[in-house]
């Protein structure tokens, strides 16, 4: 071995050792400046002999040239998600289910961890060397983020120690500590860059950079929590034992992993972590509870996309107090007027909240809310801000009532509130600019006509410049006219025109959904399309005939009937067809001739599916003669419950309706 090769090997070994002490053991032996000096020395030597650079060298973390797109990686072992519980009662019920399934009265030993609020990733090591990394994606296929993961200093490019498996895929969470998040946003505000709403968004944005050099500048870190592939080696037979082995090989593991020998010990762990949450230095949204024994995990198995041996115990939504500075009124695509509270900005669960929906006039009355009031804000599910209550004991002297508008705040048309409904609506229809904008945004959306590149800002400009009044006008746009819009060059304009042309080929169900008929969602649109087959038959249907469609009651039937009775709506449909919008002719299915357990059955899908998309499942069920409905009723024959099935599953059980899981559905589809 040449002297320079020996020097390179020693430097790399030294740097890996100090990375391990810093990121895994949290016990650095040298100052950052000394680490930087060693890194500079290694870079200088590698510059002299680039032929001696190895892929696992610490210098190779900075990334290669920017990518144009992410490749896909299929997970050999699916990356499953967890079911959630939100209170002690639900956790104790979960604990009982586990014990009942194990037919044991002895307490289960639980391994409890933090539920990190970051991005789940899988990292594959072959003979101890990092070879690939991927996002969770849909659980089956993720994005190849290898170049970006290599830039995260907490993740070893090469494992160290003995008995490392030939192939080892570890799973874990990439996240951004709060200090790093604040620094990124501080720099962004100073330079006019993108300011992130919370550390999770910043971590996601950093990890999905096409340029790994940008990712390298972000202080991302990582904790390992599980394993996917294991070949050519062995691991301990407990979850905690595996985590300790990962740590010995150089992978970072949270120091808050704890074994609990009773349900009460789990609850104590949960409450201790909840109390420490503000001081952890990074965001979490609960704790994860897993059966520690791998043998018991195997015995318990899986259901749908989640293991029976683990659960996420989520924290309650965080709340903060702030002041309502004003209330504004927004108009949606159906004319619904929604009051929105403008708040004194406040941090809630890691997000700066300045607005909260007030839903409707009844909600304002229920709260007894006045402008100027001090209120409690909650981020329900840590996402949607809402006003929980007014702090009446601290009501300021200078408050004023909230006056609901008698005319549309956008177009000035009269407003109406139908008896029995909580929503107040603008009566202006498409003469209302707000309704027109929202209707067009819905029309071009991904699940409707799916016009790629037609974003909200483009729609706003088209309406404001009076270029577009109805959906049919979209298909009359030219690249020349679009080029006149802000930030729209000739190439982008032509891309939009091409996307509009492509969108003309659709399905009857998508077309109905795109029309934006009140109360007609995707499932109802699919049901109407399947039942009537043609637009002509649907337009001619009476209210009674419409109610024969699964999931369509008197309210929905009336909305559909009234929509097609309106001459202006019929005119728009005629224009759309004249512009070339079309869909395949219906395939007539004789249910009596179909040999399938689904033929003639009304089926409801609920929860998430892991083996296929919901759209694919619906299409296959319909092809086998099923009627797929969007809600559970006495007319429902079968409910297919995927992951995180909620109220629909509960209602099915209450009504005694037959319920099957995804695995059984797939078996029956192939029957």
Curated annotation (Swiss-Prot):
Domain BRCT intervals: 593-671
Q: Which GO terms describe its biological process?
A: DNA repair; DNA replication
| Broad enzyme group | ligase
Q: Where along this sequence does the record place binding of Zn(2+)?
A: 408, 411, 426, 432
- Keyword Manganese attached: yes
The domain of life for this entry's organism is Bacteria
Which Gene3D superfamilies does the UniProt record give?
A: 5' to 3' exonuclease, C-terminal subdomain, 6.20.10.30, BRCT domain, DNA ligase/mRNA capping enzyme, Helix hairpin bin, Nucleic acid-binding proteins
Q: Which UniProt keywords apply?
A: DNA damage, DNA repair, DNA replication, Ligase, Magnesium, Manganese, Metal-binding, NAD, Zinc
| One cellular component term from this protein's GO annotations in UniProt | cytosol
Describe the family membership recorded for this protein in Swiss-Prot or TrEMBL.
Answer: Belongs to the NAD-dependent DNA ligase family. LigA subfamily.
Return the HAMAP family for the record: DNA_ligase_A
PANTHER family documented for this protein: CHROMOSOME TRANSMISSION FIDELITY FACTOR 18, DNA LIGASE
Q: By what name is this protein known?
A: DNA ligase
Organism of origin is Salmonella paratyphi A (strain AKU_12601)
């Amino acid at each position: 071995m040449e002297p320079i090769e020996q020097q390179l090997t020693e430097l790399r070994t030294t740097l890996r050792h100090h990375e391990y002490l810093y990121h895994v053991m949290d016990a650095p032996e040298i100052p950052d400046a000394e680490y930087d000096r060693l890194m500079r020395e290694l870079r200088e030597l590698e510059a002299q002999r680039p032929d001696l650079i190895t892929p696992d060298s610490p210098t190779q973390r900075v990334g290669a040239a920017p990518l144009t797109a992410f490749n896909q990686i299929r997970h050999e072992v699916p990356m499953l998600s967890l079911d959630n519980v939100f209170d002690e009662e639900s956790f104790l019920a979960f604990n009982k289910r586990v014990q009942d399934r194990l037919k044991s009265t002895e307490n289960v030993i639980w391994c409890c961890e933090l539920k990190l609020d970051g991005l789940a990733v899988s990292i594959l090591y072959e003979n101890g060397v990092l070879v690939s990394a991927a996002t969770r994606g849909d659980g089956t296929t993720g994005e190849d983020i290898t170049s970006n993961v290599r830039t995260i200093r907490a993740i070893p490019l090469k494992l160290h120690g003995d008995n490392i498996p030939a192939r080892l895929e570890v799973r874990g969470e990439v996240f951004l500590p709060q200090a790093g998040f604040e620094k990124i946003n501080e720099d962004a505000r100073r330079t006019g860059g993108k300011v992130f709403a919370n550390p999770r968004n910043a971590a996601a944005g950093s990890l999905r950079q096409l340029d790994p050099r940008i990712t390298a500048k972000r202080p991302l870190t990582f904790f390992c929590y599980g394993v996917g592939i294991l070949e050519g080696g062995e691991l301990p037979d407990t979850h905690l034992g595996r985590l300790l082995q990962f740590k010995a090989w150089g992978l970072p593991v949270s120091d808050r992993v704890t074994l609990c020998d009773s349900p009460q010990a789990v609850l104590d762990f949960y409450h201790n972590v909840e109390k420490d949450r503000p001081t952890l230095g990074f965001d979490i949204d609960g704790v994860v509870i897993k059966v520690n024994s791998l043998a018991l995990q195997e015995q318990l198995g899986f259901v749908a996309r989640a293991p029976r041996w683990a659960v996420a115990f989520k924290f309650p939504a965080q709340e903060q107090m702030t002041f309502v500075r004003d209330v504004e009124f927004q108009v949606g695509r159906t004319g619904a007027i929604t009051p929105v509270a403008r708040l004194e900005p406040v941090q809630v669960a890691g997000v700066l909240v300045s607005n909260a929906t007030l839903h409707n006039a009844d909600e304002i009355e229920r709260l007894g809310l006045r402008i100027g009031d001090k209120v409690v804000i909650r981020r329900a599910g840590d996402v949607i801000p809402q006003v929980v209550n007014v702090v009446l004991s601290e009501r300021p002297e200078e408050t004023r009532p909230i006056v609901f508008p008698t005319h549309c705040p956008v177009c000035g048309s009269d407003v109406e509130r139908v008896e029995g409904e909580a929503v107040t609506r603008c009566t202006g229809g498409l003469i209302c600019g707000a309704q027109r904008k929202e209707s067009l945004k819905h029309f071009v959306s991904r699940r409707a006509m799916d016009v790629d590149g037609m974003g909200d800002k483009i729609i706003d400009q088209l309406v404001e410049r009076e270029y577009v009044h109805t959906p049919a006008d979209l298909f009359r746009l030219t690249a020349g006219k679009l080029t006149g819009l802000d930030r729209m060059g000739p190439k982008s304009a032509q891309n939009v025109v091409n996307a509009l042309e492509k969108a003309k080929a659709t399905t009857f169900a998508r077309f109905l959904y795109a029309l934006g008929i009140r109360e007609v969602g995707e499932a109802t649109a699919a049901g109407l399309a399947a039942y009537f087959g043609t637009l002509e038959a649907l337009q001619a249907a009476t209210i009674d005939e419409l109610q024969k469609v699964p999931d369509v009651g008197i309210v929905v039937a009336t909305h559909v009937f009234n929509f097609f009775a309106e001459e202006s709506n019929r005119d728009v449909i005629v224009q759309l067809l004249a512009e070339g919008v079309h869909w395949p002719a219906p395939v007539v299915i004789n249910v009596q001739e179909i040999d399938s357990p689904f033929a003639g059955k009304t089926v409801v899908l609920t929860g998430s599916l892991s083996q296929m998309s919901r759209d694919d499942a619906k299409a296959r069920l319909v092809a086998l003669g099923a009627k797929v409905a969007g809600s559970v009723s006495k007319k429902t024959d079968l409910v297919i419950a995927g992951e995180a099935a909620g109220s629909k599953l509960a209602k099915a059980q209450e009504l005694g309706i037959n319920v099957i899981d995804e695995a059984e559905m797939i078996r029956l589809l192939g029957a």
